[in-house]
Structures are given as C-alpha cells and as structure tokens.
C-alpha cells in the first residue's frame, strides 16, 4: 500500500503527474545527497518514499525543484 495515501498527496499538489515528477526529482536529490533530508524521521527507507513523505508533509513543492538552476 502506498504511504502516504494518494488523497493526502493530492491535497498538497493537484496533479498526479506533478506529484510523480516532483517525487522523482526530489528522490534523485536524496539519493545523491543523503544529508539533504528535510524531515527528522521517515517511514520509508527508499528515496522515492522519502520524497513522497516530504510532499505529504508540505515540505517540498514543485516550484522549488523545477525553478532551481544547476
């Protein structure tokens, strides 16, 4: 079962596509830099799960990730 639930995620970001792309991009950041964690405790051990938890908690928003310049 997906944790956090999809309805909790869609309450933060309307589009399922935007949730998926935001989670994927944030998961790559977490994978590359584990110290970039924004929460003190995660339920999931995998980067995608951690990214979804951050979205559900309202810590990560699509604009922050897609406007970032590399």
From Swiss-Prot:
Gene3D superfamilies: 3.90.940.10. Keywords: DNA-directed RNA polymerase, Nucleotidyltransferase, Transcription, Transferase. GO terms for molecular function: DNA binding; DNA-directed RNA polymerase activity. Pfam families: RNA_pol_Rpb6. Its EC number is 2.7.7.6. It comes from the Bacteria. GO terms for biological process: DNA-templated transcription. The RNAP catalytic core consists of 2 alpha, 1 beta, 1 beta' and 1 omega subunit. When a sigma factor is associated with the core the holoenzyme is formed, which can initiate transcription. Belongs to the RNA polymerase subunit omega family. This is DNA-directed RNA polymerase subunit omega. It comes from Staphylococcus saprophyticus subsp. saprophyticus (strain ATCC 15305 / DSM 20229 / NCIMB 8711 / NCTC 7292 / S-41). The gene is rpoZ.
């Amino acid at each position: 079962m997906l944790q956090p639930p999809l309805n909790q995620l869609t309450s933060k970001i309307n589009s399922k596509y935007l949730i998926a792309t935001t989670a994927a991009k944030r998961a790559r950041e977490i994978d590359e830099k584990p110290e970039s964690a924004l929460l003190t405790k995660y339920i999931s051990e995998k980067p995608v799960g951690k990214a979804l938890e951050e979205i559900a908690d309202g810590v990560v928003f699509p604009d922050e990730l897609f406007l970032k310049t590399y």
